[in-house]
Curated annotation (Swiss-Prot):
Gene: ispD
Lineage start: Bacteria, Pseudomonadati, Pseudomonadota, Gammaproteobacteria, Pseudomonadales
InterPro entries referenced in this protein's UniProt entry, alphabetically: IspD, IspD/TarI, IspD/TarI_cytidylyltransf_bact, ISPD_synthase_CS, Nucleotide-diphossugar_trans
Species name: Pseudomonas putida (strain ATCC 47054 / DSM 6125 / CFBP 8728 / NCIMB 11950 / KT2440)
Gene3D superfamilies per record: Spore Coat Polysaccharide Biosynthesis Protein SpsA, Chain A
PANTHER family hit by this protein: 2-C-METHYL-D-ERYTHRITOL 4-PHOSPHATE CYTIDYLYLTRANSFERASE, CHLOROPLASTIC
Top-rank taxon: Bacteria
Protein name, entry field: 2-C-methyl-D-erythritol 4-phosphate cytidylyltransferase
Chain coiled-coil ranges: none
């Protein structure tokens, strides 16, 4: 690990609808401890001295973003949300280029509904990847026994978990390399669910940096309830 952390840009794709939450609004705008999930997800970056700027990708008809206090922060720029996550991130990278970012600059992509990122995890990621030739991501080793299912919903095998990790965010890559990888995936109709997948498809191996298991992504109602109870206990 190094003492001087590298400067970085952050990208938050926030154009999704979060259908599994069955809420009255996209999940990134649900409330947690007086702020939206998106605001909490931004806070860890906005409070970091090495931040150069943030791009948030939002849906064209998003009625919620303009009402957030952080929407007027001069460090935050907006990009058009796309049909898929990869489209939204690629649009954000184009905005970074327009802001003068270089291909060699580090970009950290973070989920809009992952509000519990610890500053210590962010610093660890920046420190451990500062000189890495590829980049990498926060991740957590699998803890539970994993089962592979057949087409009838029955167990077909028990998976060796010793080499299995859960991919978290932020995911940290050089701007130019990430731009090329995502663009190539879109042209080739390759479906990627995170930025590391695109880098992998380009033939590179991202590094896994172990983070905290409580850096969860809110996907279902019980995730948000768990965070509310946890945060209430901190007060």
């Amino acid at each position: 690990m190094i003492d001087i952390l590298p400067a970085f840009w952050a990208v938050i794709p926030a154009a999704g609808v979060g259908a599994r939450m069955a809420a009255d609004r996209p999940k990134q705008y649900l409330e947690l401890a007086g702020q939206t999930l998106l605001e909490h997800s931004l806070d860890c970056f906005l409070g970091h001295p090495a931040l150069k700027g943030v791009v948030v990708s939002i849906a064209e008809d998003d009625p919620y973003w303009p009402g957030l206090r952080c929407a007027s922060d001069p460090r935050i720029h907006c990009a058009a949300g796309g049909r898929e996550r990869a489209d939204s991130v690629l649009n954000a990278l184009l905005v970074l280029h327009a802001q003068g970012a270089a291909d060699s600059d580090w970009v950290l992509v973070h989920d809009a509904a992952r509000p519990n990122l610890a500053r210590s995890d962010l610093d660890k990621l920046l420190s451990e990847l500062a000189d890495d030739p590829v980049g990498g991501l926060l991740a957590v080793p699998a803890r539970d026994t994993l089962k592979r299912a057949d087409s009838h919903g029955r167990v077909s095998a028990t998976v060796d978990r010793s080499t299995i990790w859960q991919a978290y965010t932020p995911q940290m890559f050089r701007l130019g390399a990430l731009h090329r990888a995502l663009a190539e995936c879109l042209v080739s109709d390759v479906v990627v669910t995170d930025e590391a997948s695109a880098i992998e498809w380009s033939g590179q191996a991202p590094r896994l940096v172990e983070g905290r298991s409580d850096n969860i992504k809110v996907t279902r109602p019980e995730d948000l309830e768990w965070l509310r109870q946890r945060w209430a206990g901190k007060r």
